Amino acid sequence: MCGIAGFQGGFSAGLLARMTAAVAHRGPDGSGTLLLEGEDGAAPTGLGHRRLSIIDLSEQGRQPMAAPCPRCGSAGHADLALTYNGEVYNFAELRRELRAQGHVFHSGTDSEVLLHLYAEAGLALPERLNGIFAFALRDGRAAGRPAGVERGDVLLVRDQLGIKPLYVAETPRGVLFASEIKALLQCRELPRRVDPEAVYQALAYLWTPAPRTALAGVRKPPPGTALLLRGGRIAREWRYYRLPYGQEPLAGSSAEVAAELRERLEGAVRRQLVADVPVGAFLSGGLDSSAVVAMMKRATPDARPRCYSIGFRGGVEMEGAAPDLPYARRVAAHLGVELHALEIGPEAIGELERMLWHLDEPQADPAPINALRICERAREEGMKVLLSGAGGDDLFSGYRRHRALRAERAWGWLPALARRGLAAPARALRAGRNGGWMDNVAFRRAAKAFAHADLPADERTVAYFWWNDVELRRALLAPGPRAAVDGHTGAEPLLASLAEIEDERDPLNRMLFLETRHFLADHNLNYTDKMGMASGVEVRVPLLDLELVDFAARVPSAYKQRGREGKAVFKEAMEPLLPRDVIYRPKTGFGAPLRQWLRGELREAVEETLSERSLASRGLFDPAAVRRLVELERAGKVEGAYTVFALMCVELWCRMFVDAPPPAVASEPAAAAVAAAT
């Protein structure tokens, strides 16, 4: 696990050094740069790397890794060159295969396997990999290149599920790429312009769907994407992997599918335990993290894995949710693992600027602060790898919106006019025309469930991911940005993704596809990776092992949702390993009591960040509309806490990524403005 940076085009060695230094936090164990002049008129290429050593801790694992062609016997020192971030879990199997073909290896790293495999597979290389990765591989061979590859071309790849981040920017001088946006901003000719469409989408979802980012000149390739750089331009871009929804569902009973699921999860955890450093885990006491820890214990019965959990000081918890720590302690005692519990309070929100600096994007969710605290504690105690339970809700149907989708069976058959009769009053209630009832959880959820009843089926599915209605977020924009998104609802990128699975007509599976394709890749996995790397910790996600994901896509939706019971087959699979009260406990989000904090300890921070002066100067949001939203939220008349938080995050992000000059060496904000206001 590392940080990468680089370019193809007419850039300098100084820029490469600055870009690599900007991701220094991702790799405290070593660094390297490699500048390769173009042969035969090819554009120069710069590769930078920061190393977090996990497998083969020796100097042989240093990157960028350059080698003669392992297949053609060339004497060229840098026929092939690689900068790589991630882990390939099937690297040992691939290395055995390559050795049988005559390849000779000089290290125990998965990085070297990539170079050798490219020599055999060419552009089909990423299709052979099961892992988490983003890498750039330059082919400088005079001969023996794959079809469609010219000398000096660079293959740029992001893993199948978007577990590792990758950002790309095209400039007149060439293409820049890196693990984080802050590295790209070391190029002073890259414009720091906000993309109003991306901000509009961030208000809707609290995150921005790929390929956009909040910076107009920077994009993130979707999961499973490969790009071929040539002459300082993107010569080709293609998707080498698509989520396999729309296939024939698995045959067999629920019990048989549960048994196979249990076996596949154990295999995934065993693959992801491979490391030359200690491996621990997140443990919330929820089903997903508990299942991962149970499989860790099954794979290493004599070990006591170190696990980490978090709770809120003073008994304050997520609204409408049971506390996690009692369940985490119950699981730890049941499995015989070591639990390290952290407790935080409202002061944790003082980490907001630091969180946003590491996220690179204005994601409006306090959950990354929890992940950051856990990863920092783990690293202080010598841990370099943590396993996470991310992905279980997305693959097997664990979110409330999945139940709401199922509930549509009771009214979805109604004609359009009748559905409009449900939607109009629900939207009016959500817009503030109620008696302060939005503080009531049940009322709030019911209003949201019917607010988009009049939309077509796919648009209705997308709307379950929204945190506010179209009318509100349009009103929040200043006139210029509002004109830029005229005619758009924010649903467009997710609707475009749904077109990838035209053969999948099951409504639940279509929603689960969006969970994995966007909510995971653009939100959960982005913050999981970056909070871990901010702390020098690699976070692995066994539930998103490629073989397990392909299996989950074929599990019948009737086995995922049984009545109001989500993740039914997953729960059935874990019954032999975990206590029933843990398996069937109420769902708890990995977040924070944001409504209480915004109205209490964060009140002054809201006033400062969203002041009329700040907003008018920025020109993104309408100050009067924002003021009205803040007042309605405090009165309990709108479900607006996360929208207010999104507005704050966009403004704070702009101060760091748009206003501030690019530092020579990136450094975290020394003191957050939010912290000063609290």
Specify the residue positions occupied by each region the protein language model found:
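Short amphipathic alpha-helical interaction patches enriched in hydrophobic/aromatic residues
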Residues: 6, 98-102, 185-188, 248, ...
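Short secondary-structure boundary/capping segments
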Residues: 356-358, 400-407, 664-665
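Conserved S/T- and glycine-rich ATP-binding loop of Class I adenylate-forming
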Residues: 283, 389, 520
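Active-site adenylate/phosphate-handling loop in enzymes that bind or generate adenylated species
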Residues: 160, 373-434, 459, 524-548
